[in-house]
UniProtKB/Swiss-Prot annotation:
GO terms for biological process: bacterial-type flagellum-dependent cell motility. This is Flagellar P-ring protein. Keywords: Bacterial flagellum, Periplasm, Plasmid, Signal. Belongs to the FlgI family. Residues 1-24 form the signal peptide. It holds the Pfam family FlgI. The gene is flgI.
Length: 369
């Protein structure tokens, strides 16, 4: 019961502030511009300088192969069949996001993740690694010291670890070598994407833009896209977009929605959720399995052997649930109070909410993630 109160209470605290009057947001907070996006980059490399926490090369042969290929580029040939133990080396995957409008010579952050069985990347240095896009072209070169946010220690079979040791970041660790051309407004229009389908919000955006720049400047393409006429000169588009994104718009009221995380039992709902009066019967089923060690001791001088075994007891309990009258609610506080009155834990609440939705008692979209 306390867990449910805490879970629903968080939702109430997070969304209770929305119960007031309608507020205005900037267009830049409600939309994104088509063509202005990041592009994913990926590369494969080696991290060296680890203090004995690298890959066990007998189990990760690709680390040895990569190491030999690197040495061959410097004119060093490793004899075939040589047994090399690289405890200070780890094979890694390097990922990064290439921002829009970035230029060659500028730097971006990279994430370094172990793909072998290295215990830790702390203190390691990433060797020069090419980062490529999905088209196979090289866009950046990464290299630098890996910063790990975790820590760990082990001795005599005991181990303590804080956070993750197999992945880290290198701030400004990659230098951009090639750019991705981003076109904004070159076709005479700019597309604004709201990210979600909401005809009311789209229409409010159109009205606000036309009020600022004049009639027919913007028009709705569909329930999530707005087309805006852009200046013909590229030099004028930057200032135009800056003014465009700072226009304040009042979003339309969102659809009533309840989101449930089936893995953690978290429940979040917005202020539009309404609950019709209904009756709920909730029962609990518990299964308890207990195992006790049993030792069979032979009689003296019987030449028998002592045998150890186990005895398991299985107990099933089912508690009948009484019918609870759930009062309807027209605001978020009433809905939270009514759901808490059921007394179910968060996992059981998922089934109850599904049943309420099927009975048309829950006036909201139910989404389980």
């Amino acid at each position: 019961m306390k867990t449910l109160h805490r879970c629903i209470g968080v939702a109430l605290l997070a969304l209770g502030a929305l119960a007031g009057t309608a507020h205005a947001d900037r267009i830049k907070d409600l939309t994104t511009i088509a063509g202005v996006r990041e592009n994913a980059l990926i590369g494969y490399g080696l991290v060296v300088g680890l203090d004995g926490s690298g890959d066990q090369t007998t189990q990760t042969p690709f680390t040895i192969q990569s190491f030999n290929n690197m040495l061959s580029q410097f004119g060093i040939n490793v004899p075939s069949g040589a047994s090399i133990q690289l405890k200070n080396t780890a094979a890694v995957v390097v990922t990064a996001s290439l921002p829009a409008f970035v230029r060659p010579g500028q730097t971006i952050d990279v994430t370094v993740s172990s793909i072998g069985n290295a215990k830790s990347l702390r203190g390691g240095t990433l060797l020069l690694t090419p980062l490529k896009g999905v088209d196979g072209q090289l866009y950046a070169l990464a290299q630098g010291n890996v910063v790990i946010g975790g820590a760990g220690a082990s001795a005599n079979g005991s181990k303590v670890q804080i956070n993750q040791l197999g992945a880290g970041r290198i701030a400004n660790g990659a230098t951009v070598e090639r750019t991705v051309q981003a076109t904004v407004g070159e076709a005479g229009s700019i597309q604004l994407d709201t990210g979600t389908t909401d005809f009311g919000t789209v229409q409010n955006i159109v009205n606000a833009i036309n009020k600022q720049f004049g009639a027919d400047t913007a028009e709705a393409a569909d329930g999530r896209t707005v087309n805006v006429r852009a200046p013909a000169l590229a030099a004028d588009r930057v200032g135009f977009v800056a003014k465009l994104q700072n226009i304040e718009v009042t979003p339309a009221q969102a659809a009533a929605r309840v989101v449930v995380n089936a893995r953690t039992g978290s429940v979040v709902m917005n202020q539009q959720v309404k609950l019709e009066p209904c009756a709920v019967a909730h029962g609990n089923l518990s299964v308890t399995i207990s195992t006790e060690p049993v030792v069979s001791q032979p009689a003296p001088f019987s030449q028998g052997q002592t045998v150890a075994g186990a005895r398991s007891n299985i107990e099933v309990k089912q508690q009948g649930g009484s019918l609870i009258n759930v009062k309807g609610g027209t605001n978020l506080a009433d809905v939270v109070k009514a759901i808490n009155a059921i007394g179910a834990n968060p996992q059981d609440l998922i089934s109850i909410l599904q049943a309420m939705k099927a009975a048309n008692a829950l006036r909201a979209d139910l989404e389980i993630i």
